[in-house]
Amino acid sequence: MASTPLLGSRTLDRQTARTLPPGSRLPTLAQTVLFASHRKTFFPRMRERYGDVFTIRLVPSSRVVVVLSRPEHIREVFGSSPSVMHAGEGNTVLEPIMGSHSLLLLDDEDHVRMRRQLMPAFSGQALRGYAEMVHELARAEVANWPIGKPFKLHQRMRDLTLEVILQVVFGVTDRDRLNQLRPLLDKIVSVSPVIMLGGFYPSLLRVPPWRTYLTLQRQVDEILYDEIARRRGNLAGRNDVLSRLLAAGNWSDVELRDQLVTLLLAGHETTATAMGWAFHELARRPEELAFGQRAADAGADDELEAIVKEAMRLHPVVYQVGRRLTETADVAGYRLPRGTTIMAAIGLVHRDAEHFPTPQDFRPQRFLEDDPPAPGTWIPFGGGARRCIGAGFSLMEGTEILRAALATYNFQAPNPTPEPAKPKNVTLVPARGAEVAVTHR
């Protein structure tokens, strides 16, 4: 059998081209710009024109990407062997920031081993132990919101989720250490995508702004390594994620550092944005706001969680997730060559009327009905062996934030026009910052 081109190939032979789904003939650079800046309109137009499975090409090197929008096809990918569908390779651009031991960068046995070590800190009893800590931080945050004056709630959520990372994940409670870390970590989580080019072109790391970023990263690493060393000698009575990891596994300092930075970058902006969208919708919908307030008063966690889930459905923070084929494979009825990137289009699935009646409506009750959404139709955390390890933590965090805010305030939208989404790195955030106004209940 003739060899097939790899991911970085500029051209495909005619036989390979015939195995690919149909797709746009726009120049690769044009497709890349549309994907990066307008994916919420680019993907729906592509599906409308070419069907549920289509091909796009992205820089660098005109790489081939096959996009899936049917749940059965996406389940097929998520359920495939991780050795055939690699996810870590596609994240190598993140290595200068997250580190080579990051769970997001690992594949095969390395990924299985690291995930097994991390899982106990993100499930069951551990999550229940974090909930009270998150709730107290949320109560302290909402108590400082301005009354009767419009403000951008997305930034408040960013501040709060950073505090959760600092105190609940890192376990930092010393006031001086918190004051030292906050401004540094805020710069880390606000990193420009340009910095990630250092993963492709290491020579860039010797010049600004990459050199400036490395200096910042060294400052953060120095504090994190010091915190890890202190914690190794004092785990008694600790209930944070770092302490649980130290107590349960045999970790090197570098492995721990890489996981902490990964949790910071993967869990900060995503949860903050999801909650910004949730409050944006509640402020514009009095009936759903009243539903949430009743749930907060009654301690109805399932109903509060349903609000978080519906916000993640209607406004997926990450619009797509990818895999890279390590060998030729049959996917969605096509024989795809080794090196092909496969994208599961979360945003297309979440707004498909076949799976979510009236998909444009914000209706949390759909997650509480006797016939809830079918498996593979609600996938904000991905799926299969690569499903986000922090999914349970994120839902718990969102539930506690809603509980604190909805028990305290009424919400209004100063501008009733729905906010569009705008790309920010890999996420889609409210363009006007999720502007709301609150009054005491």
Predicted regions and their residues:
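Conserved cytochrome P450 K-helix E-x-x-R motif and the immediately C-terminal K′/meander segment
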Residues: T32-G51, D226, A298-A332, A353
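N-terminal membrane-proximal hinge/A-helix region immediately C-terminal to the signal-anchor transmembrane segment
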Residues: A2-S100, L104, R113, R128, ...
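Cytochrome P450 catalytic-core helices
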Residues: T270-A295, A391-Y409
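Conserved cytochrome P450 K-helix/beta-meander segment immediately N-terminal to the heme-binding cysteine loop
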Residues: A344-D371
